[in-house]
């Protein structure tokens, strides 16, 4: 990360003099773990510890730091987990959030806030964001074919659906992404789909309306922004972003037929929620 330009101040910590920058603020976060299981060393090493170390380093340099993280409470992992445990989704989320919070304290992580995404504040934020995007012509309604299980009597979204990855052939890929090769795709691209809830293979594609974020309409602006900002990032982050920029941005569905999540604030969509990847990054 490039050092910000600002007023330089020298401080001493344990007799060692450091040059710092008091005029800049640092917001530090990390990926939000799902509330569908215990936090473990994998979360600590791959997700939470790097951000915690950087937050501590910045504070030691006298920087103005806000370090936030929290639990990702929405999406199909939570819905599927609650059903498997025979619990209400809210009780299931509460159970694991409290366990996560205790683990964060036990690990002595220095978060200023370890929050959660199923809150009134989060709902208000997402509703405001959606309204702004809609007003700018970046939201479009489309009727698409989505997987429906006759056995479960419901549409299957994301992790409620399993099948063979269309990219690498992995046989236990999720409905929206493959955990083996990292590919993302639409549900109708999944090969030999089956329900993750009942295991039923009677999955058929039925029409349903969803709202799409029109990423294709902002790709030129995004590429221009990326060109000026990516050089400031780590080589890994820059390479990943530039890899995305080499392809066309794909318009993406941001609503789901699920009983849990941030409700969609648009007439006709009262029974749908926002896709977790539209909701959680703002948490």
Q: Which role does the model predict for each range below?
A:
Residues 137-210:
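Cys/His-rich short segments
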Residues 133, 178, 279:
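Residue-level signal for inorganic ion chemistry
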Residues 76, 98, 176-179, 213, ...:
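Residues on a specific face of well-ordered alpha-helices
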Residues 1-17:
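Intrinsic disorder/low-complexity segments
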Residues 20-29, 34-142, 154, 166:
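N-terminal Rossmann-like or analogous alpha/beta NTP/dinucleotide-binding catalytic cores
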Residues 28, 35-37, 110, 135, ...:
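Glycine-rich, flexible loop/turn motifs
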Residues 20-62, 66-69, 121-124, 168, ...:
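Structured secondary-structure scaffolds
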